[in-house]
Amino acid sequence: MKNILKKIGICLLTILLLLVAFITYHMQSHPVVTIEEVISANEAAQIQMVTKKVESVVEVLKTSYAARFAHAKAHACVKAYLDVNQDIDPQLRYGVFEKPGAHYQSWIRFSNSSSNMANADDRAKDARGMAIKLLNVGENLNSGTTQEFIAHNAPAFFVASVDDFNQFLASKGDLKYFAQGYNPFKWRLRELWQLVTAFAPPPKSPLWTQYFSNTAYKLGPHNIKFMMQSCESPKNIVAAKTDDPDFLKNTLIEELAASEACMQLLVQKQDANKKMPIEDVTILWKESDSPFLPVAKITILKQQFDSPEQQQFCENLSFSPWNALKAHRPIGALNRARKWAYEASANYRHRLNKTQVPQSLDW
């Protein structure tokens, strides 16, 4: 009997060790890190597929109103200032951060990530987004005059390439996408983990969430990612009633009616000697390898933002990572796909809704 129990114990230990090795393989395996972008031979065709699928999703999910392909539900569009830190590291002084103390008007949009407005409940597990649009920065890559930083609440994304994104869209969110075939070493466990991490229970408030760029950008000669977070740790934050499907919006209404809010923008420089790839955005750039460095303060004004006119203005706004100065150019395959996907989503929904992007953004 003892021998049988011993053999069972050895088998269980072996299975456990194999399981640990298997998970470690998926979570720790990394591609070669480069400081340059890598463009695959079929990238243009893959991007064209993404664009068509974006339009298809907008069409299929439209109700009486065609919403965005992603981050369809806005909690608010609010007025804010961005001020470049006076003591910003000289190595980071490029683009809108070139001049210490530079001051910009901006709009910030807070959102849920779901594409489906028919089921847009703040209480549901979902990713959350923050996008800031700086005004009057000079001519950007899309011939506009804004600089936009778009982020969501998870530090890494759940697809590694444009091809993978197309496969995920084709699967319609079926979890079998992450475990295709009989070879477990070809499964996408790291990607599944990133998806589960992003789709978290709702925060108490959009103001007390960390928002990450996921994808990489230029900052002058550097490759960077960025993050936005509150200037201080949460203190006595009371959420609106969570039996309310719009409680995140209502929490913001209460907070910004009482006082202004402070957030900070930080950047993380790529170290090519570390596991910090540009192209595979499922891989976390570890802060132990390269810490986030503060570059600017964001002051969200005390305000009322829930008038029907401002909500419609918010719906008509369009954001894109490519509304950027050359010094902040988006890099990597997924960013290159986003250029066309965001444009397709905006053009398609504006055409269906018979609306236009607001021409005047100043306030």
Protein language model regions, located:
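N-terminal Sec-pathway targeting helices
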Residues: 1-17
